[in-house]
């Protein structure tokens, strides 16, 4: 039969999606009523009032039309100032691109530095979206396991994974899902490797304001020789509780930012116009950031102390972000079995085998409320110690 006349024939989608995973998504759906949710990496705090009132004011003032695609000059300048103040990163406002969330900034960065079949090193386990993003544009993710004792990079493993197709190293410190914060010496060595092999560094710094234990955030862009090859990624979602407002940015060398601007010009155009000024105002809400951080610090202490003495669980005290990465192999259960058992006990958890290198671990978000953390601890203890 002539295919053109067969109305039951359906065209197929591109093969690039055939093996594309969705990471933690199945476990990020709202759980049954009454179940404590320890899964979503989303601040439970309300967005700072100055941000809300500014966004509303901008809407009422008619800021609903097209605007400068790269971001308003005032916002780009504010981001450059913020990077210097908080991370000692020196960047010109012209080399900042405001994006619809940090995810979009990541995608633009990968499109900027990777040609088809180029390899990208991921320090595994890593955030669930890095690998599929790289794959979808034709890049090749190369997962390099971190040290499972503390989740810090194994430099020898990084070096041995480099080939003539390697183009970039992905850095995420503080790290989702492990909570690791890389030391200055580790960042310096990663930069040294990148210089030696002429590689780009994509540095996801979305959790840079959430560091515990008196640690410090060190960006590869602040290390000698690193600025010229590092694209910094960050955004407003985690620090200022603005996940649904979708504002992020990338900053880096001129040639990389110019290419990323072209990506945005031919896709999203720009973030919502009324969010430009609201995002700028958020950068001045330091009192909210301090209050949020104090709450996370307390919740981290509660959850670690509440779970660390349970037989079969191995807990590494998280150094940053708001995640706890728990080794459950000592319980005799797989991570999926553990998550299923926890759900029956009334706590929703994420089995980390859904991402490369996460087998045997559970990811917990202590961005949950203090009340939910206390109740979740009680339920898990009752289940595991009965």
Positions of PLM-derived features:
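Short beta-strand to alpha-helix junction loop
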Residues: 70-71
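N-terminal signal-anchor/first transmembrane alpha helix
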Residues: 20-24
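Glycine-rich loop-to-alpha-helix module at the N-terminal edge of alpha/beta enzyme cores
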Residues: 38, 62-64, 78-86
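PLP-dependent class I/II
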Residues: 1-17, 29-36, 42-58, 74, ...
